[in-house]
């Protein structure tokens, strides 16, 4: 029996396209994706790979209102779009948009099943946000089932009074095959690539927005704490852009010896080159619901150093196994972790093999399996 599913999600994120393609290809699934906006140019410089889309979709008209770090995405046309699609199940990505609530109301009026797809973790709970937490609990109490990417989100949604039977795991995923193949090809031309991209012969890699909350200044400080003999042969590369780039670059000039590079924002094709040449990926973030750059780096066979507040740390990184897990805002422990990985080539090889082995379970197909299971499971769960 075919089940009509609508996924409601914010933007056309490149890493979601393979997942939705896999779900649309499932027997018994009639999928339509409704995007609230094409992209968010203020935060995302992603190329939009619409030519790779193999599922039915539409982008709603939208307006994004900003006030400091906060934004509100407002849409029109959602109710008619849902009436036209007539889904039996809505998979809603998040609860922080007006469209999230509108789709919930539509589901209640039309007797459709409603599944919340959330990456929130306990770290999202902030002091002084009691009103937000109340609204969140009210939203959650109206859902039939829930999709989470991993252990941290699973634990958090349980604190909101949700039973284990109502929670389905759809592991966060990127196109592992794309990154693995690209990395292998790029390593075959490592010397040429380093010269072309003006990269150090050995380097630590950070990928993401260059903003304080990503821990970029902690990483720079940790690099400065490495022994000078090690820094003289090991660079640090910040791949990305953001409001802290200029401050980072100025502080980096004071580190001697050492080489700190800022190649700018990289699309996925160029990212594969950086992953292929790096010795370790470091994500010392202060807050992150997951951290998909870790998936990308592991698909390229990199050891990982990540802060324990990143949602992915509980699922993807084993301490001393394929990397290190450190507390946020602790440059001393971060420096020790970096030193332990970059000094031992044999250890890096073992960690590399383990990263490749673990990330196989975090594929677009596995994520699609979790989404499909939630859509089916929602049918059997009454509110």
Where are these regions (language model features)?
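Conserved acidic donor-binding segment of nucleotide-sugar-dependent glycosyltransferases
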Residues: 318-320, 324-331, 340-346
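Nucleotide-activated donor-binding/catalytic signature segment of Leloir-type glycosyltransferases, i.e.
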Residues: 246-266
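A short, histidine- and acid-enriched strand-loop-helix "catalytic/donor-clamping" loop
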Residues: 98, 112-130, 142-145
């Amino acid at each position: 029996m075919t089940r009509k599913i609508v996924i409601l999600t914010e933007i056309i994120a490149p890493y979601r396209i393979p997942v939705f393609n896999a779900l649309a290809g499932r027997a018994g699934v009639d999928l339509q994706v409704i995007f609230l906006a094409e992209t968010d140019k203020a935060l995302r410089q992603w190329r939009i790979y619409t030519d790779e889309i193999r599922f039915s979709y539409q982008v709603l008209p939208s307006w994004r209102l900003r006030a400091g770090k906060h934004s509100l995405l407002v849409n029109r046309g959602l109710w008619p779009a849902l009436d036209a699609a007539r889904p039996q199940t809505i998979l809603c990505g998040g609860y922080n948009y007006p469209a999230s609530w509108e789709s919930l109301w539509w589901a209640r009026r039309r007797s459709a099943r409603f599944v919340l797809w959330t990456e929130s973790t306990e770290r999202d709970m902030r002091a002084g946000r009691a009103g937000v937490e109340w609204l969140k609990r009210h939203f959650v109490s109206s859902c039939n089932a829930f999709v989470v990417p991993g252990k941290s989100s699973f634990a958090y949604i349980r604190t909101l009074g949700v039973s284990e039977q109502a929670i389905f795991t759809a592991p966060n995923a990127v196109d592992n095959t794309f990154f693995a193949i690209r990395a292998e090809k790029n390593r075959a031309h490592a010397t040429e690539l380093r010269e072309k991209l003006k990269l150090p012969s050995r380097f630590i890699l950070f990928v993401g927005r260059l903003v304080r909350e990503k821990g970029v200044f902690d990483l720079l400080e940790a690099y400065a704490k490495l022994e000078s003999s090690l820094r003289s042969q090991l660079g640090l590369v910040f791949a990305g852009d953001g409001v802290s780039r200029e401050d980072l670059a100025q502080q980096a000039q004071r580190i001697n010896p050492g080489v700190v590079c800022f190649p700018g924002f990289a699309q996925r094709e160029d990212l594969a080159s950086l992953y292929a040449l790096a010795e370790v990926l470091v994500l010392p973030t202060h807050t992150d619901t997951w951290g998909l750059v870790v998936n990308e780096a592991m698909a390229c066979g990199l050891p990982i150093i990540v802060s324990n507040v990143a949602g992915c740390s509980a699922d993807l990184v084993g301490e001393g196994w394929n990397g290190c897990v450190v507390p946020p805002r602790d440059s001393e422990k971060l420096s020790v972790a970096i030193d332990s990985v970059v000094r031992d080539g044999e250890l890096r090889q073992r960690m590399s093999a383990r990263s490749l082995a673990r990330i196989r379970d975090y594929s677009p197909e596995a994520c699609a399996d979790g989404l499909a299971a939630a859509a089916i499971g929602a049918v059997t769960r009454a509110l």
